[in-house]
Regions:
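Membrane-interface transmembrane helices that cradle and orient dolichyl/undecaprenyl
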Residues: 85, 115-118, 156-176, 186, ...
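Transmembrane-helix motifs of polytopic, lipid-linked glycan transferases
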Residues: 95-121, 155-159, 311
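Hydrophobic, aromatic-rich transmembrane alpha-helices
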Residues: 105-107, 204, 211, 288-326, ...
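Hydrophobic/aromatic-rich transmembrane helices and adjacent perimembrane loops
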Residues: 39-40, 139-140, 146, 189, ...
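Short helix- or helix-capping micro-motifs
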Residues: 123-131, 154, 158, 179, ...
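Perimembrane helix-loop-helix junctions
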Residues: 159-167, 172, 196-237, 241-242, ...
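Transmembrane-helix signature of polytopic, membrane-embedded enzymes
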Residues: 8-12, 92, 108-133, 150-151, ...
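Signature aromatic-anchored transmembrane alpha helix within multi-pass, membrane-resident enzymes
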Residues: 7-13, 202, 230-234, 360, ...
């Protein structure tokens, strides 16, 4: 392991520690969003090896956000990929460490991607920038599925480049099928995100079908591996539809629409919350807000987190593999135009799985400006196609590059001369690193603490909501049915942390829906002590509804 590898590993371990701090001190290791509550509910059920359970008799009183009741069965609306991973933490009693560990893996994979395509220094800088990112830390401390998505996306990209990054290199099934497995797992975790991640690589694969080698044998091997990749990917996609069939009885019924009928992909009436449905105008507004959040939360440099991206693009013009990594984020932005809602609270989290596009290109741009080495370690070129390529075996992209070479050379020479003048050589060597240090320091000292604290007590949910039920005197009241009197779901939803899906825990909670409904619920649990709980009076349990 090289010195740079050791530093990258240290940064990755630091990411685990930092994310765990955010999970414990900001989010208090409890779910806040409806999504998180549903994920935890699904994970607890998966520990039992179940996808569904029979719906409770009074399903509206025992509402769980984003958990659906359909045809007498109760199940989460989310695909099983992330709940299955989270269930490992639930089973081991380490639920709060699952995403921090995934965060560390995501940082390490970002380093490996940068090292492979741009060199170890760029990879290390990208890993460090990722660690400093408020966007990264907020999502890594949550119970959302995005950290898993980032690991699967980055791991897939790394294996794809190993399998198909050099169109003339020998193909290895371990790489091509490994890439298919990771893409398949992403489909089972976040299917729409998987589409956005796969889009640029799919276009690359189409190119390789026709120009994937200099010899007939190389092209045959490339096509065989691409077909194997596609077949395995389709098998995982089939598992997604099998899951939909298992929980809904219809392989093409999206459980999202069982909670909100309008929660669909596309445009027009019936899609989204507006009367006329989702439209390009709404998509433009959503995208603008999401990107504004991205430039704020990416590195915490006010609204200038994009500062080094143009220079990264300029430095990458001669690196097709780098461009392939760089378009993952824009691809996610593009496909989410078809979704009716944007994302800002946790940053633009629907684009999170393309985070490495931004961190790698920012690191590349900074390194290029500073005059650092931005070339990967040379790969061995002793396979047969390497010689033939130089003797005329070129494909479409190679021919296009040759045709554009004069124009590119003119542009590149002038850009380089503007930035890399000898008089500025020493200046930029020191100026760019100093600017980076100042920008990161600004984020760590001024922006990041406040941005993280904004998320503390999100939706008025806090671990302190659970304390009245954890007190020894409260435990003596169990087994108990608690009728929660609250106008908003948050005060009721925060207590679901103490309840299992089968309603067998010492405390179970029902959301009050009026005297008649509450009495009917109580009649179903004669073996439990009945109490009424008013969230504005924490720690006080009423034997009967209090007077208005």
């Amino acid at each position: 392991m090289s010195r740079t590898d050791q530093l990258a590993l240290a940064v990755s371990l630091l990411a685990v520690f930092a994310a765990a701090l955010v999970a414990g001190n900001i989010f208090e290791n409890v779910p806040h969003l409806e999504d998180e509550i549903a994920y935890v509910w699904q994970a607890r059920l998966l520990v039992e090896g179940k996808l569904t359970i029979p719906s409770p008799q009074h399903e509206k009183s025992f509402l769980v956000p984003f958990v659906v009741d359909h045809n007498g069965e109760r199940f989460g609306k989310y695909p099983p990929g992330w709940p299955l991973v989270l269930s490992l933490g639930v089973a081991l009693g380490t639920r709060g460490l699952v995403n921090p560990i995934l965060a560390g893996v995501g940082v390490w994979l970002t380093y490996l991607l940068g090292k492979r395509v741009f060199g170890p220094l760029v990879g290390l800088l990208a890993a460090a920038l990722t660690l400093s990112s408020p966007f990264f830390l907020i999502n890594s401390g949550s119970l959302l599925s995005h950290p898993l998505g980032l690991v699967l996306s980055a791991g897939f990209a790394l294996l794809w480049l190993a399998a198909f990054g050099d169109r003339n290199a020998p193909r290895r099934w371990s790489y091509s099928l490994g890439a298919a497995v990771l893409m398949g797992l992403l489909i089972l975790a976040r299917p729409f995100t998987a589409l956005g991640v796969a889009l640029p690589f799919g276009l690359h694969g189409l190119y390789l079908l026709f120009y994937g080698g200099c010899t007939p044998e190389q092209r045959r091997q490339t096509r065989l591996h691409l077909l194997g990749f596609g077949a395995l990917g389709l098998a995982f996609a089939g598992l997604h539809f099998l899951w939909q069939y298992r929980v809904t009885g219809d392989p093409f019924l999206n459980p999202y629409t069982l909670w909100w009928e309008y929660d669909k992909i596309g445009f027009g009436p019936g899609v989204g919350v507006t009367e006329d449905g989702h439209s390009l105008h709404i998509a433009r507004i959503n995208t603008r807000f999401s990107l504004r959040a991205a430039w704020r939360d990416l590195f915490g440099w006010s609204s200038y987190s994009w500062l080094f991206l143009p220079f990264g693009l300029l430095a990458c013009l001669r690196k097709p593999k780098g461009l392939l990594l760089g378009v993952v984020f824009p691809s996610l932005v593009l496909i989410h135009i078809f979704y009716w809602i944007g994302s800002e609270l946790f940053g633009p989290r629907y684009y999170y799985e393309g985070l490495y596009s931004l961190t790698l290109f920012s690191a590349l741009g900074a390194a290029w400006l500073a005059g650092w080495r931005v070339e990967p370690d040379p790969e061995p070129q002793d396979y047969p196609g390497a010689v033939r390529q130089s003797s005329g075996g070129v494909g479409l992209l190679d021919r296009l590059r040759l045709r554009l070479a004069p124009a590119y050379s003119w542009f590149a020479e002038r850009a380089a001369s503007a930035v890399h003048q000898p008089a500025l050589f020493k200046v930029r060597q020191y100026l760019v690193p100093m600017a980076l240090v100042l920008l990161v320091a600004y984020n760590l000292v001024y922006f990041l603490p406040g941005r993280l604290w904004e998320m503390h007590g999100l939706y008025t949910i806090s671990r302190s909501d659970l304390y009245p039920f954890l007190a020894p005197e409260a435990q003596e009241l169990t087994p108990a049915l608690i009728i929660v009197h609250s106008e908003r779901w948050m005060s009721y939803g925060s207590l679901l942390e103490l309840q299992d899906p089968r309603l067998t825990t010492p405390f179970i909670f029902a959301w009050s829906r009026g005297p008649i409904a509450d009495e009917a619920v109580a009649a179903d649990f004669p073996e439990r002590n009945l109490f009424h709980y008013y969230v504005e009076e924490p720690g006080r349990f009423y034997l009967a509804p209090r007077d208005p």
